[in-house]
Amino acid sequence: ECSRFERVSLSMITDLTVGYQLYQNRELDELELSESTLTTITSDTSNAYNDQLCEKRPTKYAYDFHFNFYCLNTDGTPNENWNKAVANRAFRRCFQEGLNLIPYYARFNKINPLKCENNYYTMKGVCYNSKGTDYVDLVAKELGIDGEKYDGKTMVHLRKSTADSIAALKKQAMDELTAIGVTFPVKAPFFFVAGNTVAQDNATVLKQCFTDSFGDDFIQLDLGTYVSSLAKEVRIPKLHGFVINGWGADFGDPVNFVGQEILHDSNAYYAVNYSNIQLVAEEPADYQKELVDEFEQFTDLVNAANAIVDDTDARYEAFAKA
């Protein structure tokens, strides 16, 4: 037997704080919790909702920092300080090798923050080779992190870093950038939706991650807000320093991911709409030529991999090298 129902109601909420109030009023059956609400519940075993918690499944998207290499100010002039900084390899390496994001991850999974860590441009489970090996495991091997396992304590990319190595990398970046006129701290424009307390708290925690990782003399998040549309108000005017965005698989092949960041392809979504690297490549300044050369090499590797259509294993290996 089955029982029928007349309708299903979907409630649109402004942020999770409002959603929690609706849940308490029994107007919602389930809800994702903000970090502060989750902390309140888990710190009190007698809390009425303490036994109603469950860890939600990982997102199906691969979330990444997407740098903007052609950042503009609100008046339409180039944000030269950021553009020079982000074109520098040592500066970008500091993000990958020295930025501790565990407090930021805790905003999305308070209990097991490092389950939010993403080490690959492609999400897990997209495709497997003939031996049943996940494509991202092939990427891990190329990155030299295939032996690193989840330990719940340390981000994978930080395990080979030391305070001295990061200090040296930071000094290298600052020396190289000072030589071309960059002033410090470099302000990284980062936007969140106005009126959303959870988004504001997320951005504030992320800003603190930069402070804790590098100090305030190197990189600082310059927080800004948009009213309703990130695309219309931030991305299209090219105001962002970087955007955190997730990409899911439209089809089960690595080109669905890495193909979004190549040059000379108007369909490369991230290259055209987020990083704006194609605009830089048209007439790169001296400080951008190494960056463009790296993208050219990456583009060649992706195109070479995409041309392999008769050997799936070789295709995946080639994409992993890219």
Language-model segments: which ranges?
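Append "and occasionally in soluble cytosolic enzymes with long acidic Gly/Pro-rich linkers
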Residues: 86-212
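Periplasmic binding protein-like
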Residues: 23, 28-30, 47, 209-273
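Short, solvent-exposed loop/turn segments at the edges of secondary structure
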Residues: 3-5, 47, 55-77, 81-86, ...
